[in-house]
Amino acid sequence: MVYEIIDGFVQAIQLIVSLNPEVVTITVLTIIVSLTSTFLSAIISVPAGAYIYAHDFFGKRLVINIIQTLYALPTVLAGLLLFLFLSHQGPLGFLDFLFTPQGMILAQMILVTPLIIGLTITALSGIDKDMRHSIISLGATKFQAIVTLIQEARFAILAAVILGFGRAISEVGAAMIIGGNIRAFPGDILSGTRVLTTAISLETSQGDFPLAIALGLILLGVAIVVNVGLNMIQSGSLWKNSWNS
């Protein structure tokens, strides 16, 4: 059994090094879907988080609690609910997003958006109160003050976006339900919906361990890159704070 495992890893590395077409297709589609969903989520989430932070309104605490609860939204549940909406009988059936990369992007956005909103609120709340008062006392409008605070908290907000990307790329439940794990046609990456996580699940169940291991190693590599990026951002933030002090 040990020799079979070793042989599986050897074959997996060969698949990666030789740029196996299926491995490349699955990896590229995964990155496209996850980057797109994270980018779109960030465009929505950062302004939304800043708005919630800067305004006092009835039920604000409840809204924040709901957002934080959605951090742990089960991916299978998110996929099921979105499936009902995107099915032909559902209210969003006219979009024809079911079993498409667009549908997977939408599913990942549902999972990532609350995370980035909540962490944006937390990042802005961590700014020194004296700085907030100083910005307002200098005559800045509320919009200008919010923009300045976002710039001040940019390291923490960027870290939130990277964490969102990590959640998106490691998601499997919603991707399986909404995407259907469809293999792409040769030469047309966007014709399929098979991403790293769903492909690993499929290949493992079919006994193709070398391919599953190869995809798993790539997913692990992405996780390492995300972690290194977070550490670099945190180091930059600490250096900035120590320099200012």
Question: What residue spans do the PLM features occupy?
Answer:
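Membrane-interfacial helix termini and adjacent extracytoplasmic/periplasmic loops
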Residues: 2-21, 78-109, 179-190
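Transmembrane alpha-helices
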Residues: 119-120, 142-177
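C-terminal transmembrane helix and the adjacent membrane-cytosol boundary/short C-terminal tail
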Residues: 121-129, 136, 147-148, 209-245
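Interhelical loop and adjacent transmembrane-helix boundary motif
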Residues: 18, 176-224
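Hydrophobic alpha-helical transmembrane segments of multipass integral membrane proteins
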Residues: 32-44, 48, 74, 154, ...
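Transmembrane-helix boundary motif in ABC transporter permease subunits
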Residues: 36-67, 142-145, 149-150, 229-232
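Periplasmic/extracellular loop-to-transmembrane helix junction in inner-membrane transport proteins
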Residues: 1-38, 55, 202-208
